[in-house]
Amino acid sequence: MNILFFITPKSEVEYLYDYYTIKEAIDKIENNDYTSIPVINEKGQYEFTITEGDLLWKIKSNYENKKRGDKVELIETLTIKDIDKYNDYKTVSANSNMENLITLATNQNFIPVVDDQNIFIGIIKRSDIIAYFNEKLNLEKSLKIS
């Protein structure tokens, strides 16, 4: 099966640019009720996926080391590329196979899809993969009953 059947295209995906500040990242994650979000560079290439946990750990570690007046400035000046990532979201190419998708989906709630130049073209959501196989399983069950 072609994995592009599952893709949510970039035009329908919220993402961040790597030069965004921590505040901009938090705002976008909060406004969309996400726990993680893909990050691309100005060329449109996938860089990494940032999670709520990555942001919180960075804020906590820097917050404790700053004077009171500098604490608000922290989230408005540090960019997300300055943050350590605790989860390494793997990508797949558009011509990848279902086995790769399933393997990655066990640990990632979405899989970023890139082309041959690492240009971000969209995501495949774990929920879409599960829904597809659930539907297929239910169809097979109904055929056996008939």
What are these regions (language model features)?
Residues 1-4, 119, 139-146:
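Short, Lys/Arg-enriched, disordered terminal segments
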Residues 1-13, 75-88:
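Bateman (tandem CBS) regulatory domains
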Residues 15-33, 39-41, 87-108, 114-116, ...:
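The conserved cystathionine-beta-synthase
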Residues 26-70:
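Acidic (E/D-rich), amphipathic helical modules within compact regulatory domains
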Residues 46-63, 107, 120-137:
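Short beta->alpha transition motifs characteristic of CBS
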Residues 61, 69, 81-92:
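Regulatory sensory and allosteric helical modules in signal-transduction proteins
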Residues 65-82, 141-146:
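Short, solvent-exposed cationic patches
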